[in-house]
């Protein structure tokens, strides 16, 4: 189990450092099954979660929204029938910060308790 899910996000402003190439492999090991996607030259973490129906997918989306609000760090969320795509990145630094890995780990924790997973 990752210790990332027990950490808290820190304030991240435009001058904050992105995760370094050296830190990236170790952080990724702590959040298996998350993928790095690059969109508009911005590195992002992304994972798809599958559910039995829309109701369960929506409940998971709302649960992720609650942890995002609590930490003041918000993902991209695409909720579809039986599927939620969660994307974490730090808008202010146009890339990945440790906060994104913390929140990915927290998302996995929410998913482990979510009803209706496939």
UniProtKB/Swiss-Prot annotation:
The lineage of its organism: Bacteria, Pseudomonadati, Pseudomonadota, Gammaproteobacteria, Pseudomonadales. This is Pterin-4-alpha-carbinolamine dehydratase. Keywords: Lyase, Tetrahydrobiopterin biosynthesis. It comes from Pseudomonas syringae pv. tomato (strain ATCC BAA-871 / DC3000). It catalyses: (4aS,6R)-4a-hydroxy-L-erythro-5,6,7,8-tetrahydrobiopterin = (6R)-L-erythro-6,7-dihydrobiopterin + H2O. One of its GO terms (biological process) is tetrahydrobiopterin biosynthetic process. It holds the Pfam family Pterin_4a. Involved in tetrahydrobiopterin biosynthesis. Seems to both prevent the formation of 7-pterins and accelerate the formation of quinonoid-BH2. May also have a positive regulatory role in the expression of phhA. Its EC number is 4.2.1.96. Belongs to the pterin-4-alpha-carbinolamine dehydratase family. One of its GO terms (molecular function) is 4-alpha-hydroxytetrahydrobiopterin dehydratase activity. InterPro entries: PCD_sf (IPR036428), Pterin-4-alpha-carb_dehyd (IPR050376), Pterin_deHydtase (IPR001533). Disulfide bonds: none annotated.
